């Protein structure tokens, strides 16, 4: 639990709140003025395969839900890169509240333009919950950077990730199922071969709306399809796997 004393020490702005991530006491500071994390980020964190010896870079970390959850699950070092200065500040404070500041290196930068300073070939893994919507799909709100390809498209993301990870390193990302072919093409052009896919369905009777993707740098072709991840049953209740990923019934 977080004490009232910590909350009053300028750790929260008037428009911010602390959300419980339901895992090992981890919390996250979020703002009503910025994009808040959703289901996709939590599902992606559960899809990542990493160990405490890995050094992971979180590309476009936002408020840091992926960075915090992945560290909590693997105890690895995470470099979180986010272009939004306010979001970086929240992640710094979230890391402080969680007592994990020494394991999270938070960088305020555009990872697309700063691969040299971030360290080419430095990381064993990269994770990314990228913007899904093209900027030509309609009006863009002031939260556009998190959901629209205003700052980064899948091709530039793939190139940056490939530059930053080692040969044999892995990239984990989620992407809309209807754009899967585009993602595979972009990754292949960046020498990232898709090795594992997991379709995500909202219910058993609906087609996948999302794909969780694992790609490996310099690998040979060959994809393993995991079973569909079903969010809810036909009665609208979370499935056992969703409950496990969200730690609804306790830590696992």
Indicate where each model-derived feature is located.
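Conserved beta-strand segments of alpha/beta enzyme cores
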Residues: 27, 77, 103-105, 193-196
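Short loop/edge segments at beta-strand edges and connector loops
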Residues: 30, 108-109, 175, 198
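Residue-level signal for inorganic ion chemistry
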Residues: 44, 129, 157, 215
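SAM/dcSAM-binding transferase cores
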Residues: 205-252
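Class I SAM-dependent transferase core
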Residues: 9-51
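Mobile active-site "lid"/loop adjacent to the S-adenosyl-L-methionine
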Residues: 130-156, 160
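Conserved SAM/SAH cofactor-binding pocket of Class I
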Residues: 46-119, 125-139
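Conserved Class I SAM-dependent methyltransferase catalytic core
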Residues: 153-208
């Amino acid at each position: 639990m977080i004490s009232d004393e910590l909350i009053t020490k300028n750790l929260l702005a008037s428009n911010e709140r602390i959300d419980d991530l339901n895992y090992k006491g981890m919390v996250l500071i979020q703002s009503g003025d910025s994009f808040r994390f959703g289901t996709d980020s939590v599902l992606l964190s559960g899809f990542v395969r990493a160990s405490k010896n890995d050094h992971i870079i979180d590309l476009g970390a936002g408020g840091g839900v992926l960075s915090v959850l992945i560290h909590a699950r693997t105890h690895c070092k995470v470099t979180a890169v986010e272009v939004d200065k306010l979001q970086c500040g929240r992640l710094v404070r979230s890391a402080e509240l969680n007592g994990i500041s020494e394991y999270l290196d938070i960088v305020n930068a555009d990872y697309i333009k700063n691969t040299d300073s971030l360290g080419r070939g430095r990381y064993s893994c990269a994770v990314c919950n990228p913007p899904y919507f093209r900027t030509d799909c309609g009006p863009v709100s002031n939260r556009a950077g998190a959901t629209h390809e205003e700052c980064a498209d899948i091709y530039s993301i793939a190139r940056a990730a490939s530059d930053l990870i080692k040969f044999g390193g892995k990239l984990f990302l989620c992407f809309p199922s209807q754009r899967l072919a585009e993602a595979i093409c972009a990754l292949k052009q960046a020498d990232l071969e898709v090795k594992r896919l997991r379709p995500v369905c909202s219910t058993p009777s609906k087609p996948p709306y999302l794909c969780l993707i694992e790609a490996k740098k310099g690998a040979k072709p060959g994809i393993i399809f995991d079973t569909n991840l079903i969010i809810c049953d036909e009665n609208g209740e979370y499935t056992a796997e969703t409950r496990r990923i969200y730690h609804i019934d306790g830590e696992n």
